[in-house]
Amino acid sequence: MPSSLEPSSKLALKGSSKIVCDYFEFALNSILYQRGIYPQEDFVTVKKYDLPMVINDDYDVQKYINNIMKQIKKWIYGSLMSKFIIVIVSKTNLENIERWEFNIETKDQEETTENGDGDGDGVGKSRQEIQKEIRTIIRQITSSVSYLPVLKDDDEYTFNVLVYTDPNTSVPIEWCDTQGDGKVLDGDNVDNVKFTSFSTDIHQVGTSVSYKYE
């Protein structure tokens, strides 16, 4: 637990948690943009990872995403979270169309202490190296529109965000999966694509998408 760590290790964990949370936030915005969940005019372009990235500029959506990331960052810092899920849902029949899964593993603290320098800045692995790995994944997410099924023009879509946490973690009621949205997509018409992963000296993050095709 963070309370038992040395001050330098706490700084390293805080820095790594921010890197992971930032990736989740920009990946979420990229998915919402690429999949047309919100109009393109709702997004603005910013520079991140030496890439032009999009973020939703609508006040209510931005507030919602910021609240999500604030809670997620706490769970990552506490090593209480193992998965971050984004589900794209049809508003017409409430069917889950796509399921984006981000797996997060916290490395063994002894291994981290041996390999890291504890400067809280991505530790032993350089920030440039981490960003290079993230750039690769972001490009893969962007290019995924070339094979993901086109969402139907005569339907509207929304998204749900879910997390997998430690069983003993206190989870706010709004995070509870009451509709079963977090379940894995099943059926003969489901495909899955795994992207490359990235890591800091503390966290390992994997990304994949499951989708239904005609």
From Swiss-Prot:
This protein's UniProt keywords: Cell cycle, Cell division, Mitosis, Nucleus, Virulence
Gene (name only): MAD2
UniProt name for this protein: Spindle assembly checkpoint component MAD2
GO cellular component: cytoplasm; kinetochore; mitotic checkpoint complex, CDC20-MAD2 subcomplex; nuclear periphery; nucleoplasm
Primary location class: nucleus
Family from the record: Belongs to the MAD2 family.
Parts forming coiled coils: none
Disruption of the gene: reported phenotype: Quickly loses viability when treated with nocodazole, which causes disassembly of mitotic spindles. Exhibits increased frequency of chromosome loss and greatly reduced virulence in mice.
Domain HORMA: 14-209
Function (record text): Central component of the spindle assembly checkpoint which is a feedback control that prevents cells with incompletely assembled spindles from leaving mitosis. Plays a key role in virulence, probably through cell cycle checkpoint functions, especially those monitoring the integrity of DNA and chromosome segregation, which might be required for the pathogen to repair damage caused by host defense.
